[in-house]
Amino acid sequence: MGGGVLKQQFVLHAPFLPCGDQPEAIRRLSQGITDGVPAQVLLGTTGSGKTFTMANVIANVNVPTLVLAHNKTLAAQLYQEFKAFFPENAVEYFISYYDYYQPEAYIARSDTYIEKSLLINDEIDKLRLSATRSILERRDTLIVSSISCIYGIGSPDNYSSMALTLEVGKEYPRSQLSSQLVRMHYQASSTPQRSAFRERGSVIDIFLAYESDLAVRLEFMNDTLISIEYVDPLTMIPSHTTSSITLYPGSHYVTPEAVREQAIRTIREELEQRMLFFEGRPVEQERLFQRTTHDIEMIKEIGFCKGIENYSRHFTGAAPGEPPTCLLDYFPDDFLLIIDESHQTLPQLRAMYRGDQSRKQSLVEYGFRLPSAFDNRPLTYEEARRYFHRVIYVSATPGDLEIQESRGHIIEQIIRPTGIPDPLPEIRPAKGQIDDLLEEIRQRLRKDQEKILVISVTKKLAEDIAAFLAELGIAATYLHSGIETAERTQILTDLRLGNIDVLIGVNLLREGIDLPEVSLVAILDADKEGFLRSSASLIQFCGRAARNIHGKVICYADRITPSMDHMLKETERRRKIQLDYNQQHKITPQPIIKPILANPITKEAGQEETRLKMQSSKELEASIKTYEEAMYQAAQEFQFDEAVKYRDLMNAAKKQLLFQKGEEENGD
């Protein structure tokens, strides 16, 4: 296990104090952790301030913490919130770094091999490395992660053993230092870029793999290190000095030489065994021999090869079938695990392993990979549970598993700081539901800034309703999984800005929608039993209207299903608690005021590129600078879809500038 070395305290910064149910929830959760309770549930209604409660608990127990979210969007939201709560501490972000990923596969029936194809997001790679660096260095580390935390990465022992500590006044032969940096996956480069270094006379500049705001300048007299400075990576202006520094590797897959040599030996042994297995199958034999020996040569020469993760077991020394090392192994034993939206996250944990193994079966069976590739995988659910020493499950609708594992340690957080109670759903006949819905929509359109969410049972119905409303002059659109992430973000922004009044979708829970303007949630065909009409889903849908003081929920159904009955009883129970609290404390519900962050890209890339062709060289240079600044700003704010668009526009502007300069030179 990795262990922190610096013992800073978590320092909570908040412009408000806990209120409502929060103080009691914070006290009980904190006490439970202190008392060694292995699992607790925070059952908090939508809008009750669960993240703020979590932040207070983290500050109280003061141990390294992992917050697990079920998708990247939610992880980014949580990261930004915790970053604001803990500006003095190491709040980190760990998600999949693939912008695009096509896994390696073989389809036997058509003899089709699909090579792995991927595009790594450089900014997210930096954040992942920053996360592991922090958890190894300091105790006041909070990492917000997606399900990526259960996927194999390099061993924390290998990673930390390859870290390089330098001290002013000591001697470091320059050639050996350069070689060590290369082994740490830093490349020699004359231009400043992440995971690189450059030598100029007595100075070595190192552009860290896990930092974008600071680079390191080492100054030598002969081989004696006389100065360590942190500098701005763009201007190279010094920021501050230090007497010592620990540099961490540029990859999680770095290995010491002895480990690498041992891995090469065991890979060869496995290859020999597999060649015997494929006796009489010359195609598979030759394929596996060529591929594996090429990989071995690459590992010998540069310590790395394409697809090195498929040999990870050989580098960690694990036996076949043993769990892979993952982010969880970088944490000390006493860490706190918070699983947000646990009713969705836990099923995800269960599903990851099965899909991974079925794909690799053909690759191993037909000689594309050694059997050890099976061990480059996510943890199984049972393996992941071994890390659940101190866990808090957080959900408005926890599942049976969380309830069972918490053994009665369930802490409710029902009261909202705004005083807004849960809306009590109305049940109306499914027959004529569209006509009734239309009248409800028209009533809200007469008011200012009131929006409507409509939950349908199919994508086709969502599209048809949106088209029907649009024909009547109502600003409506649909939202479902067939729409790309960037467009979904723009649709939600347009709803808040008033460009859209009605949003129709199938599973609007997955979008992480937090829209205080929504005053009506209409659930069509609420009596159609299924995953999206379960009691948990219905309660979650109702919560979408609980951020508006005029919030209303209508369920269109011809009968009351068991799921609907449970939803109605639970909503009524919560609503009574909330109203009694408001009356007792003389609280008047207040509307939520949430700033609207408009999508900065309002034109299609094609239109922008057409406009670029009409610009002069000087204007193009200005556009390049503008797009570059916007790209970095979007990346820092975790708006990666926007960052990619700005990057593409910047590259288009650069291409156009080169074209224009070429024409100018030819004209001369």
From Swiss-Prot:
An individual GO BP term: SOS response
Provenance organism: Chlamydia trachomatis serovar A (strain ATCC VR-571B / DSM 19440 / HAR-13)
Pfam families, alphabetized: Helicase_C (PF00271), ResIII (PF04851), UVR (PF02151), UvrB (PF12344), UvrB_inter (PF17757)
Protein name: UvrABC system protein B
UVR domain: residues covered: 621-656
Binding locations of ATP: G44, T45, T46, G47, S48, G49, K50, T51
Record's subcellular location: Cytoplasm
Record-stated family: Belongs to the UvrB family.
Quaternary assembly: Forms a heterotetramer with UvrA during the search for lesions. Interacts with UvrC in an incision complex.
GO cellular component: cytoplasm; excinuclease repair complex
Any one GO molecular-function label of the UniProt entry: ATP binding
Phylogenetic placement of the source organism: Bacteria, Pseudomonadati, Chlamydiota, Chlamydiia, Chlamydiales
